[in-house]
């Protein structure tokens, strides 16, 4: 599968909303399904740079939203059918300044698959804390250099 990453445009928003809602319900299974709403996407990504990953047919396979002033990865979601196909790594590699820019993110400890993915991508835990919906590292940071992506 060839993955193309590009900046999202207004026409992508409906598909991104659906992926965001579906992925959160699948990922955060301990939360009631009605805790998540389609409109959450608009609120949680406001002002962020959105990059979309598409497969060979132009179908959305995943997206990342970044708060650029702080190099903070706010959301990175990959469609379940595309897990372990390089979509997440492609989204990271396509981030501005990658791999030299040091990006940060937060991830719940209960989200073991995501933590494993970020560790495999050379992110390291730099703190821990609590969140409304569970215990989480307060921050995870990408190590420099990212030899894995050279």
Residue positions per predicted region:
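Conserved N-terminal entry element of GNAT/NAT acetyltransferase domains
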Residues: 1-11, 143-150
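Acetyl-CoA-dependent GNAT
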Residues: 7-81, 92-96
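Short hydrophobic/aromatic beta-strand or adjacent loop that forms the aromatic wall/cage
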Residues: 48, 134-141
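Active-site acidic-Proline motif in GNAT/NAT acetyltransferases
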Residues: 79-85, 109-110
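Conserved acetyl-CoA-binding loop-helix of GNAT-fold acetyltransferases
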Residues: 84-97, 116-120
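Short glycine/proline-centered loop/turn elements that form peptide/ligand docking sites
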Residues: 88, 92, 111-114, 131-137
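Conserved GNAT acetyl-CoA-binding A-motif
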Residues: 98-110
